Amino acid sequence: MGKKIAVVLTYYFEDSEYTEPAKAFKEAGHELTVIEKEKGKTVKGKQGTAEVTVDASIDDVNSSDFDALLIPGGFSPDQLRADDRFVQFTKAFMTDKKPVFAICHGPQLLINAKALDGRKATGYTSIRVDMENAGADVVDKEVVVCQDQLVTSRTPDDIPAFNRESLALLEK
């Protein structure tokens, strides 16, 4: 049976870091719900190749409605972490030990959620010091799986490994 995956997303996400995992999750039978501030609006990726219609407002969802969380990178996570509703939503997944998949700049939301302390993780080069300052054991690998809950990757080049490990975790 497919899992329900929340996707937190806003303008200027990294196109392929949403489209490729979304495609892989859907092909595996999972259901995605794109969450932003406003339901029904269209958000565009920073490369201009992806446009996504928002399925739900952050005000209308609860982490208990979902089995996992996807945080694509780009500029989206930095914008979302300025809104405490998204920070608390993200934190709830970590607290409840539900799978969280964060690629590139995605861990920025985890930093603000104070959810990286003691975790092994990776992310885009420019946020690794921030991740370390948040208590993460940061490694430079294409994909890191921590405590059968958190999957992180560095860049779009890592998407195949990111998808593989994320899908494997959803099967557990």
Swiss-Prot record:
Molecular function as annotated in GO: peptidase activity
Keyword terms, alphabetized: Hydrolase, Protease, Stress response
EC number: 3.2.-.-
Residues annotated as catalytic: 104-105
Phenotype seen when the gene is deleted: When combined with a yraA disruption shows significantly reduced growth in the presence of formaldehye and methylglyoxal.
Stored InterPro entries: C56_PfpI-like, Class_I_gatase-like, DJ-1/PfpI
GO BP terms: proteolysis
Record's note on what induces expression: By heat shock, salt stress, oxidative stress, glucose limitation and oxygen limitation.
NCBIfam families, A to Z: PfpI
Function, in words: Functions in the protection against aldehyde-stress, possibly by degrading damaged proteins.
Protein name: General stress protein 18
Organism (species): Bacillus subtilis (strain 168)
Lineage, opening ranks: Bacteria, Bacillati, Bacillota, Bacilli, Bacillales
